[in-house]
Amino acid sequence: MTKLSKRQQQILDFIKKEVKTKGYPPSVREIGEAVGLASSSTVHGHLARLESKGYIRRDPTKPRAIEILDADFSASNQTDDVISVPIIGKVTAGQPITAIENIEDYFPLPKRLVSSEDHVFMLEVMGDSMIEAGILDGDYVIVRQQQSADNGDIVVAMTEDNEATVKRFFKEKDHIRLQPENSNLEPIIVRDCTILGKVIGVYRVIH
């Protein structure tokens, strides 16, 4: 392989470190911060040169998709058994708040827990309306994107007021009931709502 400049070596080393410790590569912004480059275009330029020299391969449709081709980097560190799941802005599980539909970060999950055919995202929960289902304030729910739900499913739903909430879904005669799992709270009754996905798991940090 063609010899790298000092800066290119710094960037490659940082990408390797992030893949080893987190299971997925860093963003362009994170690379810039790590090596002291304020311009994202400069970082992109260095990545392009690393790619042209055969050290990495990128997927232009995915901002963090960087595969390390360096022969010295063990294949075991490529974490083929891990999938990077996007973390979307917070959604409430108490009083609904307007959904923030932007990716804040990525989180590595074992592929055995998430089918590669599923489109999955994670959301941080705020509030205590789902505590009796074991979903607590500050938890991250793992959500499979889908537009329909069966009665009793725990879903992320967007109401007619364009607010998102985590609730148990029930379609009844002339309305939809979004039922909290907290006996102190009343259900949300709406004529219609948009299902953003079904909750298939919960991730919690124990302090």
Swiss-Prot record:
CDD domains: HTH_ARSR, S24_LexA-like. The record marks A93, G94 as: Cleavage. It catalyses: Hydrolysis of Ala-|-Gly bond in repressor LexA. Its EC number is 3.4.21.88. It is an enzyme of class 3 (hydrolase). GO terms for molecular function: DNA binding; serine-type endopeptidase activity. Residues 28-48 bind DNA. GO terms for biological process: DNA repair; DNA replication; negative regulation of DNA-templated transcription; proteolysis; SOS response. Keywords: Autocatalytic cleavage, DNA damage, DNA repair, DNA replication, DNA-binding, Hydrolase, Repressor, SOS response, Transcription, Transcription regulation. The active site is at S129 (for autocatalytic cleavage activity), K167 (for autocatalytic cleavage activity). NCBIfam families: lexA (TIGR00498). HAMAP family: LexA. Homodimer. Represses a number of genes involved in the response to DNA damage (SOS response), including recA and lexA. In the presence of single-stranded DNA, RecA interacts with LexA causing an autocatalytic cleavage which disrupts the DNA-binding part of LexA, leading to derepression of the SOS regulon and eventually DNA repair. Belongs to the peptidase S24 family. This is LexA repressor. It comes from Geobacillus sp. (strain WCH70). The gene is lexA.
